[in-house]
Regions:
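Single conserved hydrophobic/aromatic residue that forms the stacking wall/gate
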Residues: 1-9
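Active-site cofactor/substrate anionic-group-binding motifs, chiefly glycine-
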Residues: 19-71
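Hydrophobic faces of well-ordered beta-strands that scaffold small-molecule active sites
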Residues: 23-27, 55-60, 79-81, 109-111, ...
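Glycine/Thr-rich beta-alpha phosphate-binding loop at enzyme active sites
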Residues: 25-31, 146-170
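Active-site-adjacent beta->alpha loops and helix N-cap segments on the catalytic face
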Residues: 33-41, 63-70, 84-110, 160-173, ...
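Glycine-rich phosphate-binding active-site loops on the catalytic face of alpha/beta enzymes
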Residues: 77-89, 154-159, 203-219
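Conserved anion-binding
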Residues: 83-159
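C-terminal alpha-helical cap/extension of soluble enzyme domains
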Residues: 193-261
Length: 261
């Protein structure tokens, strides 16, 4: 999930508590820079301190090693270094630097091998450049970097919401068998059907990213609410944003139920 405002962060936290599940609040580098690292982290820490479930703050798809070190220093509990567009040995070298720094600070690291097509904030991969993760490359990468989690490309696409992904389950099974305890991560979850989502979890996926669906629904509801006939300059923004937050809450509940084994 993504943190667009403190209001949304509180929505995620409250729903996680109701479902009694841990939660990952995930941001892009752009979001952290827009809000400001310090106020963003302080807001999430305040939510976490009052929460009855575990709360992680994760930096998604970051290509800057220095930015990740800053995130680690200021309080992120998990980061993702994305060197998937680089030659594999350069990706490994850079990931090793991030892992060494992160683990020394008690922070977990997600890496990526194989390019997931599509576009989202900070990530654009042309369809022709996207490729499935090669199991032998994934094993080499994991053995050399010691990442805690690995984003793999098995048929999903960033930003996909008009059609459903075709998951390569044979590849998923092979990756799980080769990589053992390393947590497999599925990006592009919006394009995955409910049945495929549940099967991916059964087959070993430990983290599934869903961003586009949240963004799309939030924008649709906000657009409708802000243009309603009864809106005036005196209308409270809290009241205008409330329906969108409720819609996000519904999606969070739905996805959390799919992710449970």
């Amino acid at each position: 999930d993504r943190l667009r405002s403190r209001g949304l962060g509180d929505v995620y936290k409250r729903q996680a508590e109701e479902l009694n599940v841990p939660i990952i609040i995930q941001t892009s580098l752009g979001t952290a820079e827009y809000i400001g690292f310090e106020p963003l982290i302080a807001a999430v820490k305040a939510l976490a301190e009052k929460s009855s479930v575990n709360v992680a703050l994760h930096m998604d798809h970051c290509k800057s090693i220095e930015a990740l070190k800053k995130a680690i220093d200021l309080g992120y509990s998990s980061v993702m270094y994305d060197g998937s567009a680089l030659p594999i040995e350069e990706n490994i070298k850079n990931t090793q630097e991030v892992v060494a720094y992160a683990h020394a600070h008690g922070v977990s690291v997600e890496g990526e091998i194989g390019s997931i097509g599509g576009a989202e904030e900070g990530v654009v991969v042309e369809k022709d450049a996207a490729m499935y993760t090669k199991p032998e490359d994934a094993l080499h990468y994991v053995n050399e970097t010691h990442v805690d989690a690995l984003a793999v490309s098995i048929g999903t696409t960033h930003g996909q919401f008009k059609s459903k992904a075709k998951i390569n389950y044979e590849l998923l099974k092979e990756l799980k068998a080769k990589l053992g305890p390393v947590g497999l991560v599925l990006h592009g979850g919006t394009g995955v059907s409910d049945e495929d989502m549940k099967r991916c979890v059964r087959e070993g996926m430990k983290k599934i990213n869903v961003g586009t669906e949240l963004n799309k629904n939030y924008i649709e509801v906000v657009s409708k609410t802000f243009t309603a006939d009864d809106v005036t300059p005196l209308t409270s923004l809290r009241n205008l944003l409330g329906p969108a937050n409720e819609r996000i809450k519904e999606i969070v509940i739905d996805k959390a139920s799919l992710f449970k084994l």
